[in-house]
Swiss-Prot record:
Catalyses which reaction(s): RNA(n) + a ribonucleoside 5'-triphosphate = RNA(n+1) + diphosphate
GO molecular function, one term: DNA binding
Role description: DNA-dependent RNA polymerase catalyzes the transcription of DNA into RNA using the four ribonucleoside triphosphates as substrates.
Subcellular locations according to the entry: Plastid, Chloroplast
Subunit annotation: In plastids the minimal PEP RNA polymerase catalytic core is composed of four subunits: alpha, beta, beta', and beta''. When a (nuclear-encoded) sigma factor is associated with the core the holoenzyme is formed, which can initiate transcription.
Keyword S-adenosyl-L-methionine: no
NCBIfam families, A to Z: PRK05182.2-2, PRK05182.2-5, rpoA
Name of the molecule in the record: DNA-directed RNA polymerase subunit alpha
Length: 311
């Protein structure tokens, strides 16, 4: 097995929340750099879990286009500010957060009342300004998930007066990678993979690359011991199931049904022993009855009888 090393060549904090890390993975065989880089990038961006507010209830507010007396921001601006709040959650279950502030005051994420399983990455994150002695009261639902969810696709089971919020669960904002050729010795050329990761502060770039690699490892491990079943084997099982169906399932007319029964045709398996030509040889079984059976087989089971007798 080829051995390679991974090294963090740069790490820094960007602003109040963002974290950045740059990593080098080498030496890789030619072609493996782009394979590994692309797989890691997609996994890190789409498969890592993050935490976000998904629904909000504000006292006295019925819809997102409302205004709140004594509060500088309208409801839509408050929802947009809440969308920017970054959480770190140690629990997969949905949580409820609350805040109750009497003004005048500046409302920030650090004033949220949260369970011990959740923490705010940036307590200084601005939410709203209360201009007078108005009481600002809000309740919100927090979930852990992957990717991005639009408000109209969310389903809130708590109450009809919760406002849905577009939720960004992705803990990683951006991933870049590039592949460089590295000469080792006089004849050997290897790939060097450089990965840059920007996170929202809820996880570190090191955690992001580790979790992304774990997702890929679990994905590929499941392919190691697959029990491949041939399509022919699958079809034979399906055919066996269909053949055991009784002719009553075809819902034929009384005349056609009685003719088949008198000919000792009780199941689809019995019927499949006949061609269209042979059906007409059954006593009192005319062209109309034959067409009825052929149509029912095709419509209900997707089966076509051969037109002529097999040699």
């Amino acid at each position: 097995m080829a051995q390679f090393q991974i090294e963090c060549i740069e790490s820094r904090t960007d602003g109040a929340r963002g974290q950045y890390g740059s990593f080098v993975i080498e030496p890789l065989n030619q072609g493996q750099g782009i394979t590994l880089g692309n797989a890691l990038r997609r996994s890190i961006l789409s498969d890592l879990e993050g935490t976000a507010i998904v629904a909000v209830r504000i006292a006295g507010v019925n819809h997102e286009f409302s205004t709140i007396p004594g509060v500088r921001e309208d409801v839509l601006e408050i929802l947009l500010n809440l969308k920017e709040v970054v959480f770190k959650s140690y629990n997969k279950e949905s949580q409820i957060g609350r805040i109750r502030v009497q003004g005048p005051a500046i409302v920030t994420a650090g004033l949220f009342e949260l369970s011990s399983d959740i923490e705010v990455v940036d307590p200084r994150q601005y939410i709203a300004t209360i201009c007078n002695n108005t009481i600002f009261e809000m309740e919100f639902k927090i979930e852990k998930n992957c990717g991005y969810r639009l408000a109209e696709k969310a389903v809130d089971e708590l109450s009809v007066d919760f406002l849905q919020v577009d939720s960004v669960f992705m803990p990683v904002n951006k991933v870049n990678y590039k592949v460089e050729e590295v000469r080792i010795g006089s004849n050997s050329i290897k790939d060097r993979l450089i990965i840059q990761i920007w996170t929202n502060g809820s996880i570190s770039p090191q955690e992001a690359i580790s979790q992304g690699a774990t997702v890929l490892t679990n994905l590929f491990c499941s392919l190691r011991n697959l029990d491949f079943k041939s399509a022919d084997n699958y079809r034979s099982k399906e055919d066996k199931k269909i053949s055991q169906v009784l002719i009553e399932e075809l819902q034929l007319s009384v005349r056609a049904y009685n003719c088949l029964k008198r000919a000792q045709i009780h199941s689809i398996a019995d019927l499949l022993d006949y061609s269209q030509e042979e059906l007409l040889e059954i006593k009192n079984f005319g062209q109309k009855s034959a067409e009825e059976v052929i149509y029912a087989l095709q419509k209900k089971l997707g089966i076509s009888l051969p037109k002529e007798k097999s040699d």
